[in-house]
Amino acid sequence: MQGVESRPVLALMVTLNREAQVPFVGADVDGCEALTWIANESSKPGRVRDTQCWVAHSTDVYAASVLSRAAMDTRVGTAAHEDWLADATSRMSEALLDVLRAGESANATGSESTDDKLPLEITYSRAHRWGAAFPTSIAKGAESKQYLQSGDVYAVGDWCAEPNARGAVTSGLAAATAIAQALNARAKL
């Protein structure tokens, strides 16, 4: 894993004052400078429904610009780091609210206006730097598995194929196929 180049992302977690009336529980976000993906954590099975938690990931470009502004003088625990993190949290939170409010407006019918509800607001938010979020090799069309030169070992996971559960499964299946083929080839000797 040390040889895998990755790109950072900022991850955001918020709680809302009420349920967002949007027709999705997760979405890729297009046309937003700050966000690329959002999901309703509260919609997962077994989650407490009285708290509305959403998570979001920043775009690569936004993360790069924010992290370059942070420079190296913002070590965790310092006032400079907390100021930088508060600014990133605020900007990403506003972008998330914009997306959710637009979703509510688009989802509203004539009889159910969003004007009748409390305005959608964030009650808690926190951003986090996810330093090695997504491998750059995925963007370059990486193999779905990686053979490690140290021996008969395959490294698998979402970092090899796609940054999600489907990528992890695809990667594991590709390694299993390669191992089965190697065993079959040895058996024929």
Question: Where do the model's predicted regions map?
Answer:
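Central helical "cap/lid" subdomain
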Residues: M1-E33
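A generic secondary-structure signal marking the coil-to-beta-strand transition
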Residues: L10-L12, A34-T36, Q52-W54, G151-D152
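Low-complexity, flexible helical/coil segments
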Residues: L10-T15, G46-R49, K188
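Short helix-loop capping/hinge motifs at secondary-structure junctions, enriched
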Residues: R18-F24, K44-R49, Y62-S65
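Short, solvent-exposed beta-alpha or beta-beta edge segments that form flexible loop/patches at the rim
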Residues: C32-P45
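Conserved flavin/dinucleotide-binding core of flavoenzymes
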Residues: R49-L189
